């Protein structure tokens, strides 16, 4: 199938992409990648223009998760030796918000490594959110694991705008990656967040040993739930995890996946997330033709390429960062690359404890 622009027209006219059409996209020949991105960009430009939304993550509780997600070095079940610390204090989380604001973030994401939050941890996030909202006109996203209805309402009432809980992969493939909880548990948490009035941030990871059909199944499941934000991560294997020796997905195929996610989710905040620097490498700018958002300043257990290089990438590709004009004066992002080699491992070595996860 080569008439990719007809798919964009179909989507813009209000007819959702079908499963078979989505499969055609992810199975396209490499020669078709630019044509696919052109189709995805028509949809992206219609809903988001050339704007790019910057998100920053705060790893508020690290390395102490009891779950066995095979991709994650923060699990206590693996010999991955992550940095470990308990729940940060309110002041630390608010300080992280200031740093995110100075980096130009429009969304600040508070993340904990856990199955689900204790009531005291929910209280910390709620108080931090209230204080952040008093000063910084940023959206606040929380990612605290599995939620019940009471916890979801409490977070929403405190001003949390969006809740992140990724499905990670298709329902069929999930059991090959996680055994300590069910895919349906994650779906229920996302539904609880939406029922409480928060937007749903929910996506997955490319490269968990799944088939391309699993990418499509995940995208369609997210559409059925009605998520507003879709982070797409790319597995950057972590030492000591069961997936440490898995080959990364080719960048061409990652771009096909992003194009498919954009066509399935035309209005969503589509984010190229963890692993982009390593897996997409020099093809990152092309991803902006489908995605309208990304994280800067690192992830869960890996550093990024530096916000200076990220901003330069946006500008050189002909896009523009979304900047919130109101609020306190912020530091202008530096223009010089603060990781001279552009090496993500070098960024790892200089990563601060507040550097956060993908999601």
From Swiss-Prot:
Alphabetically sorted, this entry's keywords are: 2Fe-2S, 4Fe-4S, Biotin biosynthesis, Iron, Iron-sulfur, Metal-binding, S-adenosyl-L-methionine, Transferase
Q: Which SMART domains match?
A: BATS, Elp3
Residue ranges of region Disordered? Answer: 320-359
What InterPro entries does its record include? Aldolase_TIM (IPR013785), BATS_dom (IPR010722), Biotin_synth/BioAB (IPR002684), Biotin_synthase (IPR024177), Elp3/MiaA/NifB-like_rSAM (IPR006638), rSAM (IPR007197)
Q: Please state what class of enzyme this protein is.
A: transferase
Report the sequence similarity comment from the record.
Answer: Belongs to the radical SAM superfamily. Biotin synthase family.
Assembly notes: Homodimer.
Q: What does this protein do?
A: Catalyzes the conversion of dethiobiotin (DTB) to biotin by the insertion of a sulfur atom into dethiobiotin via a radical-based mechanism.
Its name, as the record gives it, is Biotin synthase
């Amino acid at each position: 199938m080569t008439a990719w622009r007809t798919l964009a027209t179909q989507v813009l006219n209000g007819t959702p992409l079908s499963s078979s059409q989505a499969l055609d996209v992810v199975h396209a020949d490499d020669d078709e990648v630019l044509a696919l991105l052109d189709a995805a960009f028509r949809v992206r430009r219609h809903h988001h223009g050339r704007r790019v939304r910057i998100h920053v993550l705060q790893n508020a509780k690290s390395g102490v998760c009891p779950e066995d997600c095979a991709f994650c070095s923060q699990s206590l079940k693996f010999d991955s030796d992550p940095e470990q610390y308990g729940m940060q204090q309110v002041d630390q989380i608010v300080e992280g918000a200031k740093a995110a604001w100075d980096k130009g973030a429009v969304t600040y994401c508070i993340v904990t490594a856990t199955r689900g939050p204790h009531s005291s941890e929910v209280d910390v996030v709620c108080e931090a959110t209230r204080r952040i909202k008093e000063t910084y006109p940023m959206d606040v996203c929380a990612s605290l694991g599995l939620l019940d209805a009471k916890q979801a309402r409490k977070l929403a009432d405190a001003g949390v705008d969006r809740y992140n809980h990724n499905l990670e992969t298709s329902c069929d493939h999930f059991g090959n990656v996680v055994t300590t909880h069910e895919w349906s548990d994650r779906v229920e948490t996302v539904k609880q967040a939406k029922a409480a009035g928060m937007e749903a941030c929910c996506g997955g990871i490319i490269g968990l040993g799944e088939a391309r059909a699993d990418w499509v199944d995940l995208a369609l499941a997210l559409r059925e739930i009605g998520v507003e934000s879709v982070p797409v991560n790319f597995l950057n294997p972590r030492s000591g995890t069961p997936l440490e020796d898995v080959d990364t997905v080719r960048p061409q195929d990652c771009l096909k996946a992003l194009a498919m996610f954009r066509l399935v989710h035309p209005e969503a905040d589509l984010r190229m997330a963890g692993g982009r620097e390593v897996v997409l490498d020099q093809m990152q700018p092309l991803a902006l033709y489908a995605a309208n958002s990304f994280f800067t300043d690192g992830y869960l257990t890996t550093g990024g390429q530096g916000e200076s290089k990220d901003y330069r990438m946006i500008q050189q590709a002909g896009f523009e960062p979304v900047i919130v004009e109101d609020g306190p004066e912020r530091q202008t992002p530096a223009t010089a690359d603060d990781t001279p080699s552009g090496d993500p491992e070098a960024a790892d070595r200089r990563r601060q404890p507040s550097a956060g996860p993908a999601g």
